[in-house]
Amino acid sequence: MSGRRSKRSVRGVGKRSAGELARPPRAALPDWMGDSRVFLPQGYEAGYRYPLLVWLPGANPFDLGRAMSRVSLRNFVAVQAAPPATGADIAEPVWEAIDRACSRLSVHPDRIYLVGQGEGGRDAFRIACRQPRAFAGVVSLGGGFPLDEALFARIADVRRLPMLLCAPRDADEAAATQTDRTLRLFHAAGAQLALRIYPAAETDNVSRAMLADVNRWVMDGVCGAAEPRRAAYAT
């Protein structure tokens, strides 16, 4: 995935070599302990560059540690972006979270994924489509793709960006119509979208099955497995 990122996309990353990103100072690690917005995998190794999951929560309370325990305890470093200030650019907290993780932890700079929940999923789509070279993929858990916002302006780059939309089966008619329009849009544009539909979620429209699929889908991308562009349905 090298070459997909732009130096402008993640501020500061372009100023550091891959070796510097792979070997953060061990003395810095204790600063992260007890930070609820940071998740370190079990058996964290500073010499291995981990995929980074950047979480954008929805309006409801969010527990990063609990979410990651259902995604994977070993595969990823994860950070939670702070809520943007009123009227501020929704992407700014994301860049700040990425900068902080890349400067202090062992993160692979070409394996950064956005994962959003609810409205956070819609924002994840917005941010990733506006800066598609900055990310290896984007996942939305229950947040529909923002239609009619010209998010395919950089279509050549967007076509290379894998996206996953996880939706509840019991969605209302309006949500179902939006999903249908989204599939048509992606098909016409030749962009990559995997759609997976699940039984009713446990809480906040997010189920254990959704979170387990986040792990599988991201690791498929990390390991080079091709994600089919057709819709996929989970039961």
Could you tell me what each predicted segment is?
Residues 50-102:
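Active-site machinery of serine-nucleophile hydrolases
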Residues 55-59, 80-84, 115-119, 140-144, ...:
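Active-site-proximal beta-strand/loop segments in catalytic clefts of secreted hydrolases
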Residues 65, 91-95, 125, 176-183:
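Short, surface-exposed alpha-helical segments at coil->helix boundaries
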Residues 111-158:
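Primarily recognizes the serine-hydrolase "nucleophile elbow" in alpha/beta-hydrolase
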